[in-house]
Amino acid sequence: HSGGAWLAQRLHDDLGLSGACGLLDISLYRDDFDQIGLHTQVMPTQIDFPVAGKHLILVDDVLYTGRTIRAAMNELFDHGRPASIKLVVLIDRGGRQLPISADFTALTVDIPLHENLVLQRNKVGVFALHLENGDATCVTHN
């Protein structure tokens, strides 16, 4: 899974939340197959709880165009109709192509369009944000 899944699990554990924590794989819900093709490693979605009527928190590492969040919400709706969805993101880098905004954002940054911001995690759970196609490390946290 991706940085959003790592971040969601970390927040769930660190905050001592008692509710269930699920993981989405949005590979089949993306709208850019013609640009990137199908992912060969589709991971199973892990939602072992009913979503219908529940207040959900959707967590992602980097909010950019809004298309990943749209895909995640489409998959959630396939599991039921939640009462509400709140969006939590670590980084909002702007550049929206869809009318989606986060309810909670840790950091808002301007990043050139040709750069990708990637959340990485080492074996002991330390997170680092890196710019791909660049040489700067933006943020680290453990």
Can you name each region flagged by the protein language model?
Residues 17-56, 70, 98-101:
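Short, glycine/charge-rich flexible loops or terminal/linker lids adjacent to PRPP-binding catalytic cores
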Residues 1-12, 66-68, 75:
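Charged, well-structured alpha/beta interaction segments
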Residues 55-84:
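Internal catalytic or translocation cores that form aromatic/hydrophobic pockets or channels
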Residues 50-63, 114-126:
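Extended, charge-rich low-complexity interaction segments
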Residues 2-3, 27-29, 91-96:
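Conserved nucleotide-binding/hydrolysis micro-motifs of P-loop NTPases
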Residues 23, 58, 87-89:
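Structural beta-sheet core signal
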Residues 74-142:
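PRPP-dependent phosphoribosyltransferase catalytic core
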